[in-house]
Amino acid sequence: MEALVYTFLLVATLGIIFFAIFFREPPKVPNRGK
């Protein structure tokens, strides 16, 4: 059951970092990667 907690923590951390970068500089790049 610990693996589940660690996975959740990892995903949460990645999500927070992603959000921070995303909001720090708004997506001005034209369709990149999609």
Swiss-Prot record:
This is Photosystem II reaction center protein T. InterPro entries: PSII_PsbT (IPR001743), PSII_PsbT_sf (IPR037268). Belongs to the PsbT family. GO terms for cellular component: chloroplast thylakoid membrane; photosystem II reaction center. The chain crosses the membrane at residues 3-23. Its main location: plastid. The keyword Transcription does not apply. Keywords: Chloroplast, Membrane, Photosynthesis, Photosystem II, Plastid, Thylakoid, Transmembrane, Transmembrane helix. It is found in: Plastid, Chloroplast thylakoid membrane. It is a single-pass membrane protein. Found at the monomer-monomer interface of the photosystem II (PS II) dimer, plays a role in assembly and dimerization of PSII. PSII is a light-driven water plastoquinone oxidoreductase, using light energy to abstract electrons from H(2)O, generating a proton gradient subsequently used for ATP formation.
